[in-house]
Swiss-Prot record:
Catalytic activity, reaction form: a 5'-end ribonucleotide-tRNA(His) + GTP + ATP + H2O = a 5'-end phospho-guanosine-ribonucleotide-tRNA(His) + AMP + 2 diphosphate + H(+)
Pfam families (alphabetical): Thg1, Thg1C
Domain of life: Eukaryota
The name this protein goes by in its record: tRNA(His) guanylyltransferase
Binding site for Mg(2+) 1: 29-30, 77
InterPro entries: Thg1_C_dom (IPR025845), tRNAHis_GuaTrfase_cat (IPR024956), tRNAHis_GuaTrfase_Thg1 (IPR007537), tRNAHis_GuaTrfase_Thg1_sf (IPR038469)
Cofactor: how bound: Binds 2 magnesium ions per subunit.
Length: 237
């Protein structure tokens, strides 16, 4: 390949290679999705179509790199992709992995949008975009705990949001009043408020809302108790 006298500038490029023999987690997260969801009138506390769009986008990412991805887990506007310890995808370069996953996910999200929101075309003034990060976890124990953390976070956030929005939408509290009503409450308190004051049994809520979405390397989307099945999920990895 012909070279020019300007090619020396490549020497300033820095390629950060992630640690070998560690699990890589690439987590993508929606940016300004509060405003985005308001603009497209997402249902509160959960919009089933929006979550299924996230799942479909993530599934296509998993299938594109099923040889490297063990599992993916999603809640709300975020998704985590867990790569094998021995993955050599893009020679484990942090910049390549981070930009690849977030750009592929975003492309899938935009391409699949009409399937889930056929009556609401995306506006060029309000497009979805995400950030991403890569984190290395040294062993199976730690990466299992990472997945359990995201699963438990799903439950905590969803329970709060479910009660909060039912207090606002069904009980006519202001957002400030709902926030004060829930201040200092435990999980059991929130479920009791939801049932006694809003007439909603949390146990009857969608499993996808309560447990998030797990995608295996076959592309199967599951809504399961990750903590109870964590060892089974990582069998062989």
């Amino acid at each position: 390949m012909a070279k020019s006298r300007f090619e020396y500038v490549r020497e300033y490029e820095v390629h950060d290679t992630l640690l070998p023999e560690t699990y890589i987690v690439v987590r993508i997260d929606g940016k300004h999705f509060h405003e985005f969801s308001q603009h497209y009138s997402f249902e509160k506390p959960n919009d089933e179509r929006a979550l299924k769009l996230m799942n479909a986008s993530a599934k296509n990412v998993v299938m594109a790199y099923s040889g490297d991805i063990i599992l993916a887990f999603g809640e709300s506007d975020e998704y985590s992709f867990i790569l094998r310890k021995d993955s050599t995808l893009f020679r484990r370069r942090r910049d390549k992995l981070s930009t690849l996953f977030v750009s592929l996910f975003t492309a899938q999200y935009v391409a699949l949008w009409p399937k889930f929101f056929p009556e609401q075309p995306l506006s060029h003034k309000r497009l979805p975009f995400f950030d991403s990060r890569c984190v290395c976890y040294p062993n199976t124990t730690v990466v299992k705990d990472y997945l359990c953390w995201r699963y438990v976070d799903t439950h905590i956030n969803n329970l709060y949001n479910t009660v909060f929005w039912n207090l606002v939408l069904k009980c006519n509290l202001t957002p400030r009043e709902a926030e004060q009503r829930l201040s200092g409450t435990l999980s059991s308190d929130k479920q009791e408020i939801l049932f006694s004051e809003c007439g909603v049994n949390y146990n009857n809520e969608s499993e996808m809302f309560k447990k998030g979405s797990l995608i295996n390397r076959k592309g199967e989307i599951m809504h399961i108790d990750v903590v109870k099945q964590i060892d089974e999920l990582f069998a062989g990895f």
